[in-house]
């Protein structure tokens, strides 16, 4: 499961942002997950719940926004938004398409707090 390595990198990125902002607690992590990212949302959530236990994200809620696949057809010039992993143009059924969005997983926002250490 590559979701474990993805979550490990995500938590590391969260920790870097928290340190840069002098926060010692992250309460929410918002990500955008593309349909073609190759990441399974349920497995990602399970991995996050497992890995967050040791560290600054231990109380964090993971919020995922699923980004549909956006393609441009190079034959009929139609732009389409798809919710399935397909690069076929729904208008003309051409495979001659270009992916515009929906391939990535992005950290969109963090909700952080500064707590007293006493």
UniProtKB/Swiss-Prot annotation:
Q: Where does Zn(2+) bind?
A: 73, 76, 89, 92
List, in alphabetical order, the Gene Ontology terms for molecular function in this entry: nickel cation binding; zinc ion binding
Q: Which InterPro entries match?
A: HypA/HybF (IPR000688), Multihaem_cyt_sf (IPR036280)
Q: Which UniProt keywords apply?
A: Metal-binding, Nickel, Zinc
Where Ni(2+) binds, per the record, is at 2
Task: Kindly state a single biological-process term from the GO annotations of this entry.
Answer: protein maturation
Q: What does this protein do?
A: Involved in the maturation of [NiFe] hydrogenases. Required for nickel insertion into the metal center of the hydrogenase.
According to its UniProt record, which protein family does this protein belong to?
Belongs to the HypA/HybF family.
Q: Which HAMAP family match?
A: HypA_HybF (MF_00213)
**What protein name applies here?**
Hydrogenase maturation factor HypA
- The organism is Shewanella sp. (strain MR-7)
